[in-house]
């Protein structure tokens, strides 16, 4: 049995082999066979001599004398390097000699001269099958069958095509596994980034405390962090000269300690009057309830009971 290695994927997708039919041969690494010079003008006399040499080669081949047949065909090719049939015939003999690389070189030469050479496609397909290049072999053999079908081509296709089918199924399987792996990796990366964002957001917030805000950008950062954690924000506007604010301040601290999932942010309107203007603060203390960056409720004045009720209501939702 011959095997073909599958693509290797990272993680859980491991290398796998396909069990294929047929025996591959070791590639022949002999020096390239003698080829003719296609630029040479061939006389009628040389064509006739080449034909005689080709006939001798075919006779020797029919008698099983492969080396002698190759010698005669080589002589024919040198005499008439424009003969596609001479190259294709020598390619067939190289296939029988189990020299697939030499056969492929001759088949290529034959097909360059005559792109419709059935024997060229046939010998190249058989040679590629010997090397385990099943898909390329099938392509050449199918073309040979289309041009001039014979039983040998049909028999070779019956050996090659099941392997091609196995390779295609194997490729589809591992393409599916690769896609599943990529989806899994993307999801893991998404989760990792989310975890980093949550960690960074959590670090930016102080659970159980009222956070004093000293700049507009700091407020935006805290609001964004709270949104990424889907947490309620109580935005508390105060002022140093405000008596009711001094009364409600300890209440805010107590609520922050009690509702640790709620983010309490404190803004002094004199320090950050642009922020107060942006939020349309008309009096202090004022409390804006914010979720995902949007105001959902509001308490104006030092209404302890109202504030506690609103925090409990929105903080638990």
Swiss-Prot record:
Keywords of the record, alphabetical order, are:
Disulfide bond, Electron transport, Redox-active center, Repeat, TPR repeat, Transport
Which processes are annotated in GO (biological process)?
A: chaperone cofactor-dependent protein refolding; response to stress
Residues of the Thioredoxin domain: 189-316
Disulfide bridge map: 242-245
Q: Where is the active site?
A: 242 (nucleophile), 245 (nucleophile)
Q: Which GO terms describe its cellular component?
A: histone deacetylase complex
Protein origin, superkingdom: Eukaryota
Q: What molecular function does GO assign, one term? A: Hsp70 protein binding
In what ranges is there compositional bias, type Acidic residues? 9-29
Where in the chain is the site Contributes to redox potential value?
243-244
Q: Where is this region: Disordered?
A: 1-48
Spell out the residue ranges that the record assigns to TPR repeats. Answer: 50-83, 85-117, 119-151
Biological function: Probable thiol-disulfide oxidoreductase that may participate in various redox reactions and act as chaperone under heat shock. May interact with HSP70 proteins through the TPR repeats.
Family per record: Belongs to the thioredoxin family.
Name of the protein in its database record = TPR repeat-containing thioredoxin TDX
